[in-house]
């Protein structure tokens, strides 16, 4: 799986959320759920999982053969609930 992102957006995300897109790749290597995003006209997805003991959400889209990361942040309450519904943790 190949990952890509806009470098300026990566830096902005790091300043805003304290999370680096480089680390977001790890979210796809751990148990996670994927749900469609309803907040954009572009087809986007949320990967919700647990990294280093905390819930994180990666907002991304698929472009050709790559996953393009748009945002990486702590999960919101409703996102954590969706994860719990599936994994029961």
Regions found by a protein language model. Give the residues of each.
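Ribonuclease/tRNase effector modules and their secretory precursors
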Residues: 1-89
């Amino acid at each position: 799986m190949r990952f890509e992102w806009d470098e300026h957006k990566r830096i902005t995300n790091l300043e805003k959320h304290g999370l680096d897109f480089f680390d977001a790749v790890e979210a796809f290597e751990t148990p996670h759920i994927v749900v469609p995003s309803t907040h954009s006209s572009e087809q986007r997805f949320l990967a919700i999982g647990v990294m280093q003991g905390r819930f994180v959400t990666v907002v991304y889209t698929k472009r050709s053969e790559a996953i393009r990361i748009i945002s990486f942040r702590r999960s919101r309450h409703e996102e954590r609930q969706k994860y719990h519904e599936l994994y029961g943790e």
